[in-house]
Amino acid sequence: MNLVLLSGGSGQRLWPLSNDIRSKQFIKIFHREDGELESMVQRVYRQIKAVDTDATVTIATSKSQVSAIHNQLGEEVGISVEPCRRDTFPAIALAAAYLKDVQGVGEEESVVVCPVDPYVENDYFEALKALGDRAAVSSANLVLMGIEPTYPSEKYGYIIPIGKEQVSKVSMFKEKPTQEVAKDYIAKGALWNGGVFAFKLGYVLNRAHELIDFVDYDDLFNKYDTLNKISFDYAVVEHESEIEVMRFAGTWKDLGTWNTLTEAMDSHAIGEALFNEKCENVHVVNELDVPILCMGLKDVVVSASPEGILVSDKEQSSYIKPFVNTLDHRVMFAEKSWGSFKVIDIDNASMTIKVTLNAGHRMNYHSHQHRDEVWTVIAGEGKTIVDGMEQNVKAGDVITMSAGCRHTIIAETELKLIEVQLGEAIDVHDKQKFELEY
């Protein structure tokens, strides 16, 4: 199975846990069988491999999410990196070119495209495999997944099939309707459009070449910022007459708001939280190092992270986006390919950050033009390289780097340090990377 997972969005509806770097698919809220927490993307990737160990998985995403993907899934997963956001058709076209020119997938092979963050069980991925198998032999150019609706939703588009068979031709598509119109659609056998497409790779590449002047993957990547923003539905689906839909009746949820997300949580608290006996239907997600105490609350979600604190009625939590848009969006926590960082304090001429490096990983070898840095190791062991000079470090060691100094740190065990940045103009873009043979 060749599977492309679309991973985008800034996830403002799940503030304060999500931001421009950490979208909802990277938030760790699900318990695995061993008790450890996993994110939506980790859960989905695990389920895919449980169904098809040989599945080729490519994640189409923006540059800002690459580090988080490597942190959570490892370095082996394929990533088609969008230089900028251009909606789903350019993203799928770039991923298709990546599959052909980088991964070596043949044009007659089938490809399935789906969102990275559905809340589903393994039968969903078994259905995706069947969808890809159907696309490989069908005379239709596109095979879509239609979700059997469980209620008349206003949040989804609808697919109207010609018949009621497991696989049938598509009669028409309908945009997100009112609840009353949705009831009428469902009575006529309509299915939710889950944003899942299957096709032969050559079909989408041919369509991409018709709409975009490019030679190969590298050429398309280099001119990506000149492409028009357009969805796959508008660019391809609406102009295709040979389309089939395959029904799916299993569990399928879009966890796009705090209300729907808490419905899928298997415990009322993640992180340190305490409830009195008067609390009813209350969920807490706490990423801070201090406890949250809830007394006499009903139908409430409480979420706390370095980005901020949300206390909301669950129904009202669906409407937080315009309020979040008014807030300062400085990133206070992020996962990197080598570990993670959390901003502890910001002052006029300094910033203090807690950094965690995973064992066997290191930062880029880099320098800053406008700031000095001081590292204080608080746990673990490793090695620093400062202007080519190596030094073993452990808890209690302090390393000072002046502006212009090239430096990195390598973690031999999990390593934690406090980084203090000092300067009048502290800027995330003040960073120059260098090659390091190590």
Question: What residue ranges belong to the model's regions?
Answer:
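C-terminal structural segments of small proteins and small subunits
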Residues: I418-I426
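Catalytic metal- and UDP-sugar-binding loop of GT-A-like glycosyltransferases, i.e.
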Residues: L6, C114, V377, V420
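Residue-level signal for inorganic ion chemistry
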Residues: V41, A95, D117, I159, ...
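Conserved core of the sugar-phosphate nucleotidyltransferase
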Residues: E121-D216, K223-Y224, E244
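Conserved N-terminal catalytic core of the sugar/cofactor nucleotidyltransferase
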Residues: M1-L5, W15-D20, F30-V113, Y119-E126
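Left-handed beta-helix
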Residues: L201-T400, C405-A411, A425-I426, K431-E437
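Short N-terminal binding/cap micro-motifs at the start of the first secondary-structure element
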Residues: G11-P16, S23, V428
